[in-house]
Amino acid sequence: MLAIALPSYPISNFRPGRLLALAALLSVPLCAHAGRAYVTNEDGESVSVLDTDKAEVVSTINVGKRPRGLKLSRDGRELYVAVSGLPKCPPSVPDEECAKLKRDLTADGIAVIDTATLKLVRLLKSGSDPEQFDLSHDGKRLFISNEDSGTLTVVNVRTGAVETTVAVGREPEGVRLSPDARWIIVTSESGNAIYVIDAHSLKVVKSIAVGKRPRDVAFSPDSKTVYISGEFDASVFTTKIPDSDGATKLIQLRTEDKPMGLIFDAPRNRLFVSTGRRGAIAVVSIEGPKLEAEIPVGARPWGIALSRDGKRLYSANGSSNDVTIVDTTTLQVVKKIAVGKSPWGVVLDDRRG
């Protein structure tokens, strides 16, 4: 927090020039801080706070069980983190065995952290086993995928009220609001489909079959093209919204790849794709399309984030318990930072002043 010492003499003594200088001083943001990255540690039940200038961990926040998806509020004053009381159950475990695992439904929700104090201030309730979510452009609503219940929950950020619940496919994960705020896309892992939701009516418009186990979604800047990672067929798919009723394979990656996180790098017209157990970030040029590069980053990269200026890519590496920073011009690793246990997602706050 930035403290400002005000003059102690009477306001009548101020000249116009002094008043203008004081006004300029008071316009300095009161919450200015160094650039930060926030990283969820799924098995560590915490969020690591990184100073991106120094490339080091400066704080750790205990946040709740199984923190995964995370987003910053539009003004950067709050950090939202999806937490879940449902134990891990990988795809190799039968559904009937997963159903026997002990769960704590009271732990489910979206944890809200004050970024000035780095304290947990409240828990917004959602559906069962929230995993990923997106934030409305006005910052008033969260759109939350609930993996266990096959639903999308719409939550009012201010009141905490659940405004509506939308049935989607089995094991929803990726959630993305289009840049024009017209569409919400939700991936259904087990349903091998994406669901297209009208963001105004909050009704499902259609579902589109997409490969095997779609995980994450990215939009083109014009909101017309959607890119989807297909984990079990090592591919990236694409479709047109809202007209298309099908998806096409954009590119086939290596068979050992397990695509998860997606980011569209608009200035360079390319995608960054985390490949899970393959331990790399795939760089895919939309032109062609073609595989530009593969960047080894760590064990099981999952969530990824791109800096505001597009110069740095951050990768949360779940099995090596670290975050990797990549120079997006040279496509070389510039730094690795140890964080908590099983980092899952990362989000950046690199606004200045």
Language-model segments: residues:
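Predominantly soluble domains enriched in secretory-pathway, periplasmic, or organellar proteins
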Residues: 25-353
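Bacterial N-terminal signal peptides that target proteins for export
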Residues: 4-21
